């Protein structure tokens, strides 16, 4: 059986505000994004969506940044936790602009930094 290769678009458009969200261009990162349900959420309501299967310690850095009313947020140094519970650091950076955004990943520890 051959696995079918999927490719992600370079941008995801938000249907509500027509904002463009640029995706990471690293192939391994793309593969990891494809594995995750609800992989990237653009939050138009400026509130973080709490998912029952998403630990709060993952959401808190993004929530703190949003509470600080940052207009641009850069999320980088994503530490993916693989199914066998080994941490795998990927130098993935996802930049958000023109509004407030949230990111949700099933097994990721996120560091949120302000972009000047």
From Swiss-Prot:
Species whose genome carries this gene: Saccharomyces cerevisiae (strain ATCC 204508 / S288c) (Baker's yeast)
Name of this chain's protein: Putative uncharacterized protein YOR102W
Highest taxon listed in the record's lineage: Eukaryota
Note: Almost completely overlaps OST2.
């Amino acid at each position: 059986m051959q696995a079918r290769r999927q490719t992600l678009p370079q941008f995801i458009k938000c249907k509500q505000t027509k904002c463009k969200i640029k995706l990471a261009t690293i192939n391994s990162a793309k593969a990891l994004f494809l594995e995750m349900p609800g992989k990237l959420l653009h939050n138009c309501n400026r509130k973080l969506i709490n998912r029952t299967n998403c630990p709060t310690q993952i959401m808190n850095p993004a929530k703190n940044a949003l509470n600080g009313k940052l207009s641009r947020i850069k999320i980088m140094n994503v530490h993916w936790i693989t199914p066998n519970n080994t941490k795998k650091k990927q130098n993935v950076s996802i930049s958000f602009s023109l509004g407030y955004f949230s990111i949700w990943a099933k097994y990721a520890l996120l560091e949120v930094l302000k972009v000047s």
